[in-house]
């Protein structure tokens, strides 16, 4: 229990030290702005809101198991939430560091300059800041494990703050706390200063960046423990702030400035306090730099992990660590040199980044997990109000503060602490006339005159202030009141740029010459102001530079005059070419967007084509088409990407800038109305800023999509390269194996090959059409369904006859293969003239039926045939197979064996008449069939199956039924062909898909088949004479042979038993089909003989 309480109080000490900072110096000033009662109430309210927001973070962390602020935001709102939190955290820490430097410059220069006998000048201040940052802040910040050394300073810093509070109390006693004079000099409730003080109060309690590290450091993390720790810490800090604010305001009343230590007289105690404050602030730097450096690291360098988290606390490389630390330390030092007073930077940072980090983001994160959270609603809306109203109030009220103090510093008016106090008092009294503080940004001329009187009354008091200051103050008052016509921001800039008149005119003209034509004079430019602004609303800005310039602009309009001009300069080069007749920039950008979006449809088209190519049963034509479609969109997408990026003009802004410079030189003398035009320009530019930011966001999203599309394109190009390599290897293997092509085989695919029958038919005919048409070896025929090649005409000749002969044939398959072929009626005419068919049979008696496969194209019908031609045709038919070469040749040999029976039948002779006339064409087309193989590279396995069917399908159905007295192995081959037909007509549900034998196995399977081919050719005439003598009705006595001892079918199975069972099933189906079709053909043959 004691250890737990000790660790708890240690954590409370750390939290209090992280909360209390230089903002305590501004508490008397805030009490002066709001009044004592209202100031105390606002402090209590901000303390409650800070506690609520800390609990929001703790509860969200316990639910989502995330332990970083950015991780919580990413979990709730994705990458946008993470970016918002990181940028806000960076801004808050940078603002705190700048505040530290301002305090060091104010207090340290007032302490060290008198010791060294120097005047408190700007040079002394800059030198002091550089020395402190180089010798104190930088070494502390470069330590990697700073927390151990920082904790040792926590107790010391708290002791110092306690001493500081007692000094404030003693000062109030000295200034008559009990005399009661202050009761009439102080104010109790002043609503005018609420929106100026609330952001300072909110930032004074800012500890959200320390919530999750503290939660992680607990031995037993729990929401209840965290709530008690932060409640105790915030109560201590609230009491401390109220005491310092009250006693400081009572001590100095209306003379209270933003840094209350400036008012203290120079004595050893106050000097010790000042030095102690400087040291505590310098030592507290690492507390601000640590989270700022981590946020910069994750924002700029760290990538998102696979689990969606970011390595926020990971190891940082030494070079990056040093570069980030140096950038933060010296960058904020420059800011401390440029911004002279504490309340300005504290108010602005608290109103913008402080409200986001302290109130808005925690409330949004908590609302994401808990829908009904009234406290989150309150915190959210108060934070939004601070963000909007307080930012405007702070900027409008303090616009003149940098002018006063910088001019005083440049002129050497800040002789010592007393002189600085008087200047501050004079400036504060100007801001605070009798209850007119809220109207500072819109004061009229009479209040300006009152200001004059007040200034003269209070500034003439100090001896150090020269007498020429009153006219200066008068001039400033007159100039600063001119924007009181409604806008406070632009005239501050005009005043700031006014002394060098020619330079001022050039700058303003650069910001105003939107239209760019040289003929236009400044007076007509006023009515045209709306036109460029309207165009500016529609024109999407450049994504990076524009957004970077707009973000600070939206946060504080008019805070930085150069930013408005910079935005104008970036906008105008885009608009000037429009007025001069050049192609406008805006359409270029809008045209580039379709180019940017183009890769997405292109990639979708490629995906669909590739899926079709992978899923298509015919592996030749769709794959080739997919190849063409895949290559073209890659190029077009690359062109569109290049077009989308090159669409942004690169050289035109240069020409526009030159044109603007010329116009600025021409119009340099026209100064009438330049300031009023600057005001109008800024108003109009601000009006279009929101829409321009939307365009920028949209453009960024499109660019992210482009990156994703490019990745997809790269992957698809790699896939295509792999496919091309496979294609080349296949072609080489085919060329090597062409020597061993003429190989017979009796392989039958198992029945029920798992492919759609209509697509099989189309695949069967595709090779023949392409092989017989050498002029179009690789192009798909337009009429073919699904982009496949149209079937050949010889298939059209066979199929109508087979409709009569085979009742088991699926009629739906026939139109798919031969619906668009011309000579479908040829076999019917031949059937009507059986004598002509018999003549053709006598003339082509030696014809090998293997020619029937691809010989039936229309050609001069009188060309005779010879066995040499038949052999050439057989070789040509075998070239159509790519992976299934062995099976193709085996089937052709089977068809040759079946041919003698076909020659003896009248009806079977009829197709030979057309085939006889086409032998020469088949010989020509034989060599051209080799290119067909290139199309099968995408899907080799299905292609082998389809070529198998293609080689055996037509002839076996017509000739096999009359195979009488065929030797057993030849009879088996005929049955194998019928089995192929049966397999295509009736897929067996029990059998799996048949795959082709790999190319490496072809030579082994093909050698015995080549011997069979030679044997079959030698016995061809003898078999035909024997078969011619048998009667048509006689069946072969050796039909019982089902399984031959040739090589097993090309079925990829794991054991011999499965292969035998597959072959048995095929043979059984083939036998049934052969008997059935034989009876039907015998009946039709008898009818024709009669």
Curated annotation (Swiss-Prot):
Disulfide-bonded cysteines: none
Location in the cell: Membrane
Keyword Transport: yes
InterPro entries hit by this protein: AA_transpt_TM
Reactions that this protein is recorded to catalyse: L-glutamate(out) = L-glutamate(in); L-glutamine(out) = L-glutamine(in); L-alanine(in) = L-alanine(out); L-serine(in) = L-serine(out)
Keywords, sorted A to Z: Amino-acid transport, Membrane, Phosphoprotein, Transmembrane, Transmembrane helix, Transport
Region span, Disordered: 441-675, 729-831, 857-1037
Tissue distribution of the protein: Expressed in neurons, astrocytes and epithelial cells scattered throughout the central nervous system structures including striatum, ependyma, cerebral cortex, hippocampus, hypothalamus, thalamus, pons, and cerebellum (at protein level). Highly expressed in paraventricular hypothalamic nucleus, suprachiasmatic nucleus, anterior hypothalamic area central part, in lateral ventricule and in dorsal 3rd ventricule (at protein level). Expressed in choroid plexus epithelial cells (at protein level).
Main location: membrane
Start-end of Polar residues biased regions: 923-936
Entry annotated with the keyword Membrane: yes
Modified residues (Phosphoserine): 441, 608, 636, 887
Pfam family, one: Aa_trans
GO biological process, one term: bone development
Biased composition (Basic and acidic residues): 441-454, 493-508, 517-528, 544-560, 587-596, 607-623, 654-665, 729-744, 758-767, 954-973, 1004-1013, 1026-1037
Superkingdom as given in the UniProt entry: Eukaryota
GO cellular component, one term: Golgi apparatus
Transmembrane intervals: 9-31, 36-58, 84-104, 123-143, 153-173, 229-249, 272-292, 323-343, 345-365, 378-398
Membrane topology: Multi-pass membrane protein
Modification Phosphothreonine, positions: 769
Membership in a protein family: Belongs to the amino acid/polyamine transporter 2 family.
PANTHER family given in the database record: AMINO ACID TRANSPORTER, SODIUM-COUPLED NEUTRAL AMINO ACID TRANSPORTER 10-RELATED
Protein's recorded name: Solute carrier family 38 member 10
Gene name tied to this protein: Slc38a10
């Amino acid at each position: 229990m004691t250890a737990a309480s000790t660790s708890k109080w240690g954590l409370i000490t750390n939290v209090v030290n992280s909360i209390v900072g230089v903002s305590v110096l501004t508490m008397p000033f805030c009490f002066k702005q709001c009044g004592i009662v209202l100031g105390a109430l606002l402090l209590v309210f901000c303390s409650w809101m800070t506690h609520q927001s800390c609990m929001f973070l703790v509860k969200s962390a316990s639910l989502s198991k995330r332990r970083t602020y950015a991780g919580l935001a990413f979990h709730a709102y994705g990458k946008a939430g993470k970016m918002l939190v990181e940028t806000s955290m960076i801004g808050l820490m940078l603002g705190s560091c700048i505040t530290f430097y301002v305090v060091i410059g104010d207090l340290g220069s007032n302490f060290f300059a008198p010791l060294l006998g120097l005047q408190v000048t700007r040079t002394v201040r800059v030198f002091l800041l550089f020395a402190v940052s180089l010798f104190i802040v930088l070494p502390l910040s470069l330590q990697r494990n700073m927390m151990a050394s920082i904790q040792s300073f926590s107790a010391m810093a708290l002791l110092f703050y306690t001493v500081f509070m007692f000094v404030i109390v003693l000062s109030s006693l000295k200034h008559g706390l009990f005399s009661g004079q202050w009761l009439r000099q102080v104010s109790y409730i002043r609503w005018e200063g609420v929106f100026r003080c609330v952001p300072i109060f909110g930032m004074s309690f800012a500890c959200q960046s320390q919530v999750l590290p503290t939660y992680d450091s607990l031995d037993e993390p729990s929401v209840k423990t965290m709530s008690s720790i932060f409640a105790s810490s915030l109560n201590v800090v609230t009491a401390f702030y109220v005491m310092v604010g009250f006693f400081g305001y009572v001590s100095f009343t209306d003379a209270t400035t933003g840094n209350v230590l400036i008012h203290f007289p120079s004595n050893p105690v106050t000097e010790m306090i000042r030095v102690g404050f400087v040291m505590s602030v310098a030592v507290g730097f690492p507390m601000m730099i640590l989270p700022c450096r981590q946020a910069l690291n994750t924002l700029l360098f760290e990538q998102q992990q696979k689990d969606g988290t970011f390595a926020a606390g990971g190891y940082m490389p030494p070079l990056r660590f040093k570069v980030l630390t140096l950038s933060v330390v010296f960058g904020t030092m420059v800011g401390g040199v440029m911004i002279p007073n504490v309340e300005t930077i504290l108010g602005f940072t608290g109103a913008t980044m402080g409200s986001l980090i302290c109130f808005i983001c925690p409330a949004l994160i908590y609302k994401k997990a808990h829908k009904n959270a009234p406290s989150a609603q309150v915190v959210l809306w108060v934070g939004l109000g601070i963000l909007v109203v307080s930012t405007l109030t702070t900027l409008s009220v303090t616009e003149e503060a940098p002018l006063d103090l910088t001019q005083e510093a440049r002129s050497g008016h800040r002789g010592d602490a007393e002189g600085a106090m008087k200047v501050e008092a004079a400036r504060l009294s100007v801001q605070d006339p009798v209850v007119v503080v809220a109207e500072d940004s819109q004061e009229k001329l009479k209040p300006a005159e009152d200001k004059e009187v007040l200034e003269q009354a209070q500034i003439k008091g100090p001896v150090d202030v020269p007498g020429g200051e009153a006219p200066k103050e008068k001039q400033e008052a007159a100039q600063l009141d001119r924007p009181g016509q409604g806008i406070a921001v632009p005239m501050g800039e005009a005043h700031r740029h006014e002394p060098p008149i020619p330079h001022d005119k050039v700058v303003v003209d650069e910001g105003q010459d939107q239209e760019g034509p040289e003929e236009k004079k400044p007076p007509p430019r006023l009515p045209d102001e709306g036109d460029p602004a309207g165009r500016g609303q529609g024109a999407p800005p450049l994504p990076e530079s524009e957004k970077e310039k707009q973000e600070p602009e939206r946060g504080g309009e008019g805070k930085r005059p150069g930013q408005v001009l910079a935005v104008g300069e970036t906008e105008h080069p885009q608009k000037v070419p429009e007025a001069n007749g050049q192609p406008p920039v805006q359409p270029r950008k809008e045209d580039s967007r379709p180019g940017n979006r183009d890769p997405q449809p292109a990639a979708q088209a490629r995906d669909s084509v590739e899926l079709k190519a992978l899923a298509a049963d015919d592996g030749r034509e769709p794959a080739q088409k997919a190849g063409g479609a895949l290559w073209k969109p890659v190029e077009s997408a690359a062109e569109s990407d290049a077009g989308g990026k090159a669409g942004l003009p690169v050289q035109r802004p240069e020409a526009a800038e030159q044109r603007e410079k010329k116009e600025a030189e021409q119009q340099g003398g026209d100064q009438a109305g330049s300031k009023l035009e600057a005001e109008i320009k800024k108003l109009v530019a601000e009006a279009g800023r929101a829409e321009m930011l939307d365009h920028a966001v949209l453009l960024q999203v499109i660019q992210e999509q482009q990156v994703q599309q490019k990745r997809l394109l790269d992957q698809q190009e790699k896939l295509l390269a792999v496919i091309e390599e496979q294609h080349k290897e296949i072609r080489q293997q085919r060329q090597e194996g062409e020597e061993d092509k003429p190989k017979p085989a009796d392989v039958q695919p198992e029945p029920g090959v798992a492919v759609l029958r209509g697509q099989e038919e189309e695949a069967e005919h595709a090779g023949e059409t392409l092989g017989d048409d050498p002029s179009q070896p690789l192009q798909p025929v337009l009429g073919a369904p699904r982009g496949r090649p149209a079937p050949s005409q010889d298939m059209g000749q066979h199929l109508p006859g087979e409709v009569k002969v085979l009742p088991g044939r699926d009629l739906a398959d026939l139109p798919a293969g031969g619906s668009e072929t011309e000579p479908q009626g040829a076999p019917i005419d031949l059937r009507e003239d059986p004598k002509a068919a018999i003549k053709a049979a006598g003339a082509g008696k030696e014809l090998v039926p293997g020619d029937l496969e691809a010989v039936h194209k229309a050609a001069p019908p009188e060309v005779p045939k010879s066995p040499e031609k038949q052999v050439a045709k057989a070789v040509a038919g075998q070239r159509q197979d790519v992976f299934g070469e062995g099976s193709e040749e085996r089937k052709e040999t089977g068809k040759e064996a079946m041919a003698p029976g076909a020659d003896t039948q009248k009806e079977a002779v009829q197709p030979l008449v057309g085939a006889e006339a086409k032998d020469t064409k088949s010989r020509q087309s034989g060599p051209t069939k080799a290119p067909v193989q290139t199309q099968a590279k995408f899907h080799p396995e299905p292609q082998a199956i389809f070529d198998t069917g293609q080689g055996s399908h037509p002839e076996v159905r017509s000739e096999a039924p009359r195979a009488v007295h065929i030797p057993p192995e030849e009879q088996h081959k005929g049955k194998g062909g019928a089995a192929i037909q049966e397999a295509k007509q009736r897929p067996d549900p029990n059998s799996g898909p048949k795959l082709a034998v790999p190319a490496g196995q072809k030579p082994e399977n093909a050698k015995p088949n080549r011997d069979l081919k030679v044997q079959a050719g030698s016995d061809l005439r003898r078999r035909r004479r024997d078969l011619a003598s048998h009667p048509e009705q006689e069946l072969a006595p050796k039909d019982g042979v089902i399984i031959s001892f040739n090589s097993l079918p090309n079925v990829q199975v794991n054991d011999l038993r499965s292969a035998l069972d597959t072959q048995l099933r095929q043979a059984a189906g083939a036998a049934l089909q052969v008997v059935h079709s034989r009876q039907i053909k015998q009946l039709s043959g008898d009818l024709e003989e009669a």
